[in-house]
Amino acid sequence: MKRNQRLLSLLPASLLVIAAFAGCTDETIIYRDRPLYEEPLETALGFVGYTSTDSKLVVCGNCHVSAQAQWDSTAHAGAWNTLQASPGAQAFCEGCHTVSDLGNAVSEPAGHSATGEERYYDVQCESCHGAGLAHVEDPNKNTVPLAMMNVGDVLGDAGTGCAECHTGDHHPFAEEWAASGHGTVNAYPAGRDGCENCHTGEGALDMFGVQTNYTEKADLGEDGQHMAITCAVCHDPHGSDNGAQLRFPIDAPSEELNLCIQCHQKRGRPDPTTFR
């Protein structure tokens, strides 16, 4: 009986101690966004690469969600694994299967070529657009890294966009393009109203309804300058539902929906002396 009384007498004191400790454990939950990117090494020259290599979330994709989703379905998104699975893989191939100085305006080792880091695996946004760090730190229209549309002199120009990788004995697409009618601009039709849609790259993009910006755009039209029908005029670099990332299918029985026929359809009967 005395023991029970002693326990009861201690109960108020115990409750006071518990209340005091409860007051000391008051918590405020602070939510923090995850970091959008890891600060790149100085030698990477401003290339940021992946936020998460495992999930293949590019830093750019944190904001440009639809572009990330399109890119996910392209061969560029799996370029590193494609190389590793090839029995002919060589170290010198890595620059075209990663974010590096190839495919953009950078002229010295950058990204994977400079650091060897996994965050630069695959052909990501920056492979064509160039370093994105400045835009990530200060996202405004003046810091947007623009991709190149021109292919230029594929045999000698070091800054030739797509042609820096899609070239050579392995896949001579740039050489084939340069030898085709698409590789040159015929000044006469290019400068005529009604002809520019099929004789200039900028005109074709406008006809296709593509509203975009690129490095050369500001200079086009000045002093008769026009862009040829380059790779990205017919192929969507961000991806598409058509084969080879084409902007339109090539088997649609429609002048409005067939990529080639939108231009190559102006004669009543075939003429082997002209591309049209």
Regions found by a protein language model. Name each.
Residues K2-L11:
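Bacterial N-terminal signal peptides that target proteins for export
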Residues P12-A13, Q245:
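Enrichment for repetitive, rod-forming helical segments
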Residues A19-G23:
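C-terminal motif of bacterial Sec signal peptides marking the signal peptidase cleavage site
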Residues C24-R276:
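Short sequence/structural segments immediately N-terminal
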